Each structure stands twice: as C-alpha cells, then as structure tokens.
C-alpha cells in the first residue's frame, strides 16, 4: 500500500500564507480601549483638569479684571525679569550643556561616572534646598567672595543650576548614537574640526538641543523655590513672576494670581510648540540628507 502523507495545510489552514493572521497578543480592541481610557483618565486628572481649573479661576472676574492683573506695572516688570533671565539662562545652558554632554560621551577621564551622576542632582534636590545652597555660596557671607544675593546674577545662577540637566540629558543619547564614520570621512577629505562640528555633528544635534532648550526655558519661567532666597524678590530686579504670584495669593487676590499663571502657561506652551516644529523640520532635513 502507498502511504498517504497528510497535508499540514489541510490540518492547520492557518499555516497558509493566504489566511489572514489573527490579532497579536495584547492588541485586541478591548485591551486597546482599556489602555487608552486609563491614559486619558490619568492625563485628565493630573494635567487637563488642573489647567482647566486655573483657566476658569483666571476668568472669574471677567476680561477687564484679567487684563488689569496681567498689565499692571508689577506684573509687567515680573514678566520682563522672568523672560530676560530665563532666555539668558537657556542660552548659557545650551552652550555649556552641549560641552558637558560632549565631554561625558566623547572623552574619558577619572571620575566620569561620578560627574555623570551629579548632572541629575538638580532633579533630585528640593528647589528650596538649591536656593539655600546658592545663598551659602553666593550670599553676603560668600566663602569665595562672590556676593550675588538680591541680584539678577544670583537668580541667573540659581536658574542655571536647576535647568542644566535638561540640555545635557537631551543631547547625550543623540551623541551616543551618532555615526563616527561620517566625521572620519569628513576629516579624511580635509575638513577641519570646527567645520566637521558645524556641518556634520551640529545638524544632527539640533533637534535635541531645541528640545532641551524648550524644557529648560519652560522650567525657568515657572521656577520659584530655587530663587526665593538668593533673589529676594526685589521688584523690577529679581522678582520673577512666580514670586509675584505668591504676593498676589498672600494678598488674597487668587484671580490675579491665576491670570499671571495663565500668561506663563501660554508662553511656555508657545515656546515648546515652536521649538518642537522647528526641531521636527530639522530632523526631517537630516533624514533626507542622510
């Protein structure tokens, strides 16, 4: 007798390429809906509802009261101080954050891991402690002879301290993934070090730099704890908007405080949106040129 070999496709038709595959584990519509629902609820409770509440409170006195709150001399001066110092701090951290990230990725030296861990210290340190540290180092009894208490430079140093990690941590992963062969090829063609950096490395780092700058700027304009002691809230000099908000709350003007908060939120959102768009275009250009 001739042995008949069973056709495996007849026994298990799902092995045939003509049979559409079933849903992958964890991708069912019910599971997806559950995940999306949980994410939406959590995002609403933690972010959206508080933002809606502060917007509602800022409109409690009507448009006229809102405008009076944000256009008063004290408010305008606090905006000026906040934006000026925050912009300066962002530029400083862009430069030195890039240098630090470069050193941590491209150079080897004793204590490298310790330095890398110290970068995250401002994230873990309570901001009021950061202000106390700044006061101890740069206050009237400064052990190094730098008396920055109640000066804009003191506020600048404090904000630079708490925002530096944003740039470093944004740039580091991109530097680690950069293809060194492209740099070596440019060098073999006679390109100088600065030319290689500006034409090969910097375009690849631009999206990360913009992302870090946006986060650093947004953190700086809303910072309170790190500047409260070293700055001293001198009107028109060191009083940032967050300190003016505290003054309004202490004077039982919660509507005015909410109005100032909305302006800061709007500025932060617009800056992040613009930098995200610019960074996205830069990333696309980099992909097309690769």
Residues of each region from the PLM?
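Short, Lys/Arg-enriched, Gly/Pro-containing loop segments at transmembrane-helix junctions
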Residues: 182, 281-290
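The alpha-helix within a helix-turn-helix
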Residues: 186
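Glycine-rich helix-loop "coupling/hinge" segments at transmembrane-helix boundaries
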Residues: 226-252, 289-290
């Amino acid at each position: 007798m001739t042995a008949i070999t069973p056709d495996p496709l007849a026994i298990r038709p799902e092995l045939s390429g003509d049979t559409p595959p079933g849903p992958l584990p964890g991708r069912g519509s019910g599971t997806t809906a559950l995940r999306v629902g949980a994410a939406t609820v959590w995002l609403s409770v933690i972010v959206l509802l508080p933002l809606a509440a502060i917007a509602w409170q800022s409109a409690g006195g009507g448009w006229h009261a809102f405008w009076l709150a944000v256009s008063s001399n004290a408010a305008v001066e606090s905006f000026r101080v906040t934006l000026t110092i925050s912009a300066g701090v962002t530029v400083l951290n862009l430069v030195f954050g890039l240098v630090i990230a470069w050193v941590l990725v491209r150079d080897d030296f004793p204590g490298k891991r310790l330095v890398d861990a110290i970068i995250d210290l401002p994230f873990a340190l309570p901001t009021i402690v950061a202000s106390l540290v700044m006061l101890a180092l740069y206050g009237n009894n400064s052990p190094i002879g730098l008396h920055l208490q109640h000066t804009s430079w003191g506020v600048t140093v404090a904000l630079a301290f708490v925002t530096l990690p944003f740039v470093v941590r944004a740039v580091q992963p991109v530097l680690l993934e950069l293809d060194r062969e492209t740099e070596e090829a440019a060098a073999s063609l006679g390109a100088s070090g600065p030319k290689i950096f500006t034409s090969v490395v910097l375009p690849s780092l631009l999206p990360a730099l913009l992302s870090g700058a946006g986060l650093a700027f947004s953190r700086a304009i809303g910072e309170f704890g790190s500047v409260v002691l070293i700055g001293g809230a001198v009107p028109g000099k060191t009083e940032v908007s967050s300190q003016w908000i505290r003054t309004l709350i202490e004077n039982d003007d919660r509507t005015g405080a909410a109005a100032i908060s909305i302006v800061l939120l709007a500025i932060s959102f617009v800056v992040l949106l613009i930098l995200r768009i610019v960074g996205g275009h830069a990333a696309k250009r980099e992909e097309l040129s690769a």
